């Protein structure tokens, strides 16, 4: 059996929900406290045993490449001033086996994944979406990507991460129709539906941005017609793959952060700041102070 060694991180979206900040800055470089969101995704991949990562970028995304490249002037300056801990933080991002490819036009997630065909070759691989941050700080819980890899080692089949969402929110996600009850958190899947209306949704199990796929997906994506939003949808291709190979779904019950919209991004930033050793105490005191002030404004 071929080991899962490679991951794809699509990062070619326009980031329109965060304009004007993302006019010249990649959305994936917006910081959660002091770390770009994409770095959290890369760290999950490495913690899961991934050895090579391809980031699919678009226009105005050069900042992502710069972040993971060495910066001699900065490193020399930190070394000269004895700021060794900061130097270690900078070095962490430059020793990773990263590759980059540009998606010329944003034609959807399926097309972004298709750009990785040569990089992947004939190996199973992981797709990790940057809008979904999974908490990997609990030492007693495997990272979600590692869970998918472990599932593949048992089933030798593609496996998609899912999570239960409120029924009224299903139109924001790809949704699975499970064939039966889960066995140890793993569902066999009947069909995959991209962003159904609530009345048409086969379940409340939503795809949440971690996919372990087999290389057969590429021949399907090459023929895939545009779907929802007139984009090439990865969910549609996975549904086609499921007709010739078994595709499973792993239910995730850990902590997931959605940083794809402003409110989700702010909640994530607040949660991470409350764990950050340099700011957590002052932030807690400020939140308490702010809460008291808000109480006084109640009618």
From Swiss-Prot:
GO terms for biological process: biosynthetic process; UDP-alpha-D-glucose metabolic process. It catalyses: alpha-D-glucose 1-phosphate + UTP + H(+) = UDP-alpha-D-glucose + diphosphate. Keywords: Nucleotidyltransferase, Transferase. InterPro entries: GalU_uridylyltTrfase_bac/arc (IPR005771), NTP_transferase_dom (IPR005835), Nucleotide-diphossugar_trans (IPR029044). Pathway: Carbohydrate metabolism; nucleotide-sugar metabolism. It comes from the Bacteria. Its EC number is 2.7.7.9. CDD domains: UGPase_prokaryotic. One of its GO terms (molecular function) is UTP:glucose-1-phosphate uridylyltransferase activity. Belongs to the UDPGP type 2 family. This is UTP--glucose-1-phosphate uridylyltransferase 2.
């Amino acid at each position: 059996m071929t080991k899962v060694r490679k991951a794809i991180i699509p990062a070619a979206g326009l980031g329109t929900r965060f304009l004007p900040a993302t006019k010249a800055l990649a959305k994936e470089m917006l910081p959660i406290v002091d770390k770009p969101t994409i770095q959290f995704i890369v760290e999950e991949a490495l913690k899961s045993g991934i050895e090579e990562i391809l980031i699919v970028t678009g226009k105005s995304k050069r900042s992502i490449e710069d972040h993971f490249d060495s910066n001699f002037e900065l490193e020399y300056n930190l070394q000269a001033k004895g700021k060794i801990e900061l130097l270690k933080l900078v070095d962490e991002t430059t020793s990773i086996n990263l590759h980059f490819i540009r998606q010329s036009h944003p034609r959807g997630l399926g097309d972004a994944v298709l750009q990785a065909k040569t990089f992947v070759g004939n190996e199973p691989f992981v797709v990790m979406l940057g809008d979904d941050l999974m908490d990997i700080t609990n030492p007693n819980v495997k990272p979600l990507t590692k869970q998918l890899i472990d599932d593949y080692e048992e089933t030798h089949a593609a496996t998609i991460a899912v999570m239960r969402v409120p029924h009224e929110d299903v139109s924001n996600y790809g949704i699975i129709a499970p064939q039966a009850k889960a066995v140890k958190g793993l569902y066999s899947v009947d069909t995959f539906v991209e962003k159904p209306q609530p009345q048409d949704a086969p379940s409340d199990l939503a795809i949440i941005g971690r996919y372990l796929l087999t290389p057969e997906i590429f021949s399907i994506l090459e023929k895939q017609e545009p779907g929802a939003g007139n984009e090439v949808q990865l969910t549609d291709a996975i549904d086609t793959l499921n007709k010739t190979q078994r595709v499973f779904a792993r239910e995730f019950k850990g902590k997931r952060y959605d940083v794809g919209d402003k409110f989700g991004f702010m909640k994530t930033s607040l949660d991470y700041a409350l764990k950050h050793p340099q700011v957590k105490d002052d932030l807690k005191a400020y939140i308490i102070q702010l809460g008291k002030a808000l109480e006084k404004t109640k009618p």
